[in-house]
Amino acid sequence: MALSVEEKAQIVTDYQQAVGDTGSPEVQVALLTANINKLQGHFKANGKDHHSRRGLIRMVNQRRKLLDYLKGKDVSRYSALIGRLGLRR
């Protein structure tokens, strides 16, 4: 259910600010978004899986906190990231 190593590596290379950057808010938000999107399909098939739903809610909250941080630091990077990921904020 989790992202494969190849998928993670592709996301990191797409959103990194510099070579080897894995901790920037953009990379973290992109990884969380990919995990959240993958879990959405799981919940369509397994609607009663409440333990995984708790993990999903935790990921959504973490992504929201990172987006709020990025919005406070640099609004242009925030806007670009939201546009790229297709988030509604």
From Swiss-Prot:
Pfam families membership: Ribosomal_S15 (PF00312)
GO cellular component terms attached to this protein's record: cytosolic small ribosomal subunit
Xref: SUPFAM superfamilies: S15/NS1 RNA-binding domain
Keyword Glycoprotein belongs to the record: no
Keyword Disulfide bond on entry: no
Gene3D superfamilies: 6.10.250.3130, S15/NS1, RNA-binding
Keyword vocabulary terms for this entry: Ribonucleoprotein, Ribosomal protein, RNA-binding, rRNA-binding
InterPro entries noted in UniProt: Ribosomal_uS15 (IPR000589), Ribosomal_uS15_bac-type (IPR005290), uS15_NS1_RNA-bd_sf (IPR009068)
Annotated GO biological process: translation
A GO term, aspect molecular function: structural constituent of ribosome
Subunit and interaction comment: Part of the 30S ribosomal subunit. Forms a bridge to the 50S subunit in the 70S ribosome, contacting the 23S rRNA.
Family of this protein: Belongs to the universal ribosomal protein uS15 family.
Entries under PANTHER family matching the protein: RIBOSOMAL PROTEIN S15, BACTERIAL AND ORGANELLAR (PTHR23321), SMALL RIBOSOMAL SUBUNIT PROTEIN US15M (PTHR23321:SF26)
Function according to Swiss-Prot or TrEMBL: One of the primary rRNA binding proteins, it binds directly to 16S rRNA where it helps nucleate assembly of the platform of the 30S subunit by binding and bridging several RNA helices of the 16S rRNA. Forms an intersubunit bridge (bridge B4) with the 23S rRNA of the 50S subunit in the ribosome.
Name this polypeptide is given: Small ribosomal subunit protein uS15
Gene field: rpsO
